[in-house]
Amino acid sequence: MLIPRKVAHRKQHHPGRTGAAKGGTRVTFGEYGIQALESAYVTNRQIESARIAMTRHIRRGGKVWINIYPDRPLTKKPAETRMGSGKGSPEWWVANVKPGRVLFELSGVAEPVAREAMRRAIHKLPMKCRFVVREGGA
């Protein structure tokens, strides 16, 4: 699981989920990628589940890059607790994903295999995504 080793503050304000991604919108490391079409919080478990789905399909060949990291804690108060008495304890670690962000990249396999592997990974994610191919050039 992806979890930060050390954080300055245990609890954070909720980040904004509106607007488009400012960076990381192109496939840079691999040949193929998964691009988000909606904004969402992606938990560390969802990232790991998508990674496993991809790697199981491509078997031995290919390399996978994960371009997002769950560095924000989401808190939750216990069930049947009265309001007040502070913020709840950190429950999950999430990555704040905005539209246009490339989440995963893949190389070293044929396009049909990559397309199917990415399709399986997209089913594990909480938002609409699309398969993208690296643009020609440098």
UniProtKB/Swiss-Prot annotation:
GO biological process, one term: translation
Keywords assigned: Ribonucleoprotein, Ribosomal protein, RNA-binding, rRNA-binding, tRNA-binding
MF term (GO), any: tRNA binding
Pfam families: Ribosomal_L16
Biased composition (Basic residues): 1-16
Coiled coil: none
Assigned GO CC terms: cytosolic large ribosomal subunit
Domain of life: Bacteria
Keyword Ribosomal protein attributed: yes
SUPFAM superfamilies: Ribosomal protein L16p/L10e
PROSITE patterns noted in UniProt: RIBOSOMAL_L16_1 (PS00586), RIBOSOMAL_L16_2 (PS00701)
Residue segments, region Disordered: 1-24
Assembly and oligomerization: Part of the 50S ribosomal subunit.
Function noted in UniProt: Binds 23S rRNA and is also seen to make contacts with the A and possibly P site tRNAs.
Family membership: Belongs to the universal ribosomal protein uL16 family.
HAMAP family assigned to the protein according to its UniProt record, in alphabetical order: Ribosomal_uL16
Protein name: Large ribosomal subunit protein uL16
Source organism of the structure: Frankia alni (strain DSM 45986 / CECT 9034 / ACN14a)
